[in-house]
């Protein structure tokens, strides 16, 4: 089960993730968070941003969903040198030219840049660039989430779940209970696929 693997991976890194975010929060009065992705990966940020804007004080943590194509087209509009920024890159392969270019531009343009790289491919360029960078938190997704097909069902849902786990304010035990319930619900739905197919036919 991809979601269980994603949660287990998060749980193993939970202390490091919390320390990473706390260090940023303690150092800066205002932090801009950019959820960035190319293609379907961009929709992860689009989906999550309204929720995080609701639960965070935007005077401290300001969440934004910006497609990498938009950042590359107008970098100076989205990346400000004097604004502490957490660039959260969502990427299935981690090799999209605009995703790689977004990271390069952010490094050039933002003085206080932090990164969280959420990707499904350990061998991708984004994952490789994150290695050894203390200001870049690499969160690799389960190998099974690296969809080979056109539809990015596993990668999309896995990356979205990980981002929720990273930024949600709930305690670990609450998160674990919610993920368990989510997995059970999904299994119930999948268990009814045959019944639905019979009705359709």
Question: Which role does the model predict for each range below?
Answer:
Residues 20-27, 78-81, 200-201:
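Glycine-rich helix-loop-beta junction characteristic of Rossmann-like nucleotide cofactor-binding loops
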Residues 15-21, 176-201:
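Cofactor-pocket helix-loop regions in the catalytic cores of large enzyme subunits
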Residues 26-35, 83, 187-198:
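Short, charged low-complexity intrinsically disordered segments located at boundaries
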Residues 9, 13, 169-172, 196:
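Generic macromolecular interface patches on structured domains
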Residues 8-12, 64-67, 93, 184-191:
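Short, flexible loop segments at the rims of nucleotide/cofactor-binding pockets, characterized by
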Residues 1-31:
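An N-terminal, well-structured beta->alpha segment
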Residues 28-182:
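Glycine-rich phosphate-binding loops that contact phosphosugars or nucleotide phosphates
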């Amino acid at each position: 089960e991809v979601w269980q693997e994603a949660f287990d991976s998060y749980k193993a890194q939970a202390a490091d993730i919390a320390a990473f975010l706390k260090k940023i929060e303690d150092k800066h009065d205002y932090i801009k968070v950019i959820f960035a992705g190319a293609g379907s990966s961009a929709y992860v940020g689009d989906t999550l941003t309204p929720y995080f804007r609701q639960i965070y004080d935007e005077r401290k943590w300001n969440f934004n969903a910006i497609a990498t194509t938009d950042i590359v087209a107008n970098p100076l509009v989205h990346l400000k040198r004097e604004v502490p920024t957490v660039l959260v890159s969502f990427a299935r392969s981690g090799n999209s030219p605009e995703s790689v270019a977004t990271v390069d531009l952010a490094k050039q343009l933002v003085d206080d840049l932090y990164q969280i790289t959420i990707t499904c491919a350990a061998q991708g360029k984004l994952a490789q660039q994150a290695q050894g960078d203390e200001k870049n938190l690499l969160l690799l997704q389960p190998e099974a989430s690296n969809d080979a097909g056109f539809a990015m069902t596993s990668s999309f849902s896995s990356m979205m779940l990980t981002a929720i786990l990273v930024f949600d304010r709930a305690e670990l035990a609450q998160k674990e209970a919610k993920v368990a319930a989510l997995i059970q619900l999904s299994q119930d739905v999948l268990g009814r696929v045959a019944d639905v197919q019979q009705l359709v036919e």
